[in-house]
From Swiss-Prot:
One of its GO terms (biological process) is translation. Binds to the 23S rRNA. Pfam families: Ribosomal_L9_C, Ribosomal_L9_N. This is Large ribosomal subunit protein bL9. The keyword Ribonucleoprotein applies. Transmembrane segments: none annotated. It comes from the Bacteria. SUPFAM superfamilies: L9 N-domain-like (SSF55658), Ribosomal protein L9 C-domain (SSF55653). PROSITE patterns: RIBOSOMAL_L9. Belongs to the bacterial ribosomal protein bL9 family. Keywords: Ribonucleoprotein, Ribosomal protein, RNA-binding, rRNA-binding. One of its GO terms (cellular component) is ribonucleoprotein complex. GO terms for molecular function: rRNA binding; structural constituent of ribosome.
Length: 151
């Protein structure tokens, strides 16, 4: 019997996969426990529509990430901050990923989730710093942050 897997099953099949399995196994275990459904023509058509919608959503999200990457890596996109600093160019306080995201949105209108910034620790010195951002699977950008001394 041909079945369409609804959930991933280790060693048997992945979600959305169509496989031929013994009738008893399909009816008594897979279908009964909600792991699969029978591969009728209507179920196969539904599966194709769902897979196409998922692929379109993936492509749209990737295109949006590419667009944000272009904006972030533009030469004019530099997030500026003013902060008090000591004599050795060390800041009193620090610039966290949350502040960087807020500054980016305020100065350029670009929204990025702060969890996507790969900043191991907050910035604690004056000058330019490059902050890598993982926007999407395979799409990475760099935000340039410039911190100047406050008068």
């Amino acid at each position: 019997m041909k079945v369409i897997f609804i959930k991933d099953m280790k060693g048997k099949g992945k979600r959305g996969e169509v496989k031929n399995v013994p009738d008893g196994y399909a009816q008594n275990f897979l279908i009964k426990n909600g792991y699969a459904k029978e591969a009728t023509s209507s179920n196969l058509n539904t599966l194709k529509r769902v897979q196409k919608a998922e692929k379109d959503a993936y492509e749209a999200e990737k295109a949006a990430a590419e667009d944000i990457k272009k904006k972030l890596e533009d030469d004019k996109t530099i997030v500026n901050f003013k902060s008090k600093a000591g004599t050795d160019s060390r800041l009193f306080g620090s610039i966290s990923s949350k502040k960087i995201v807020e500054g980016l949105e305020k100065q350029y209108g670009i929204k990025v989730d702060k969890r996507k910034l790969e900043l191991p620790e907050p910035i604690k010195s004056l000058g330019y710093t490059n902050v890598p951002v993982k926007l999407f699977k395979g799409v990475e950008a760099v935000i340039r942050v410039h911190i100047t001394e406050q008068d």
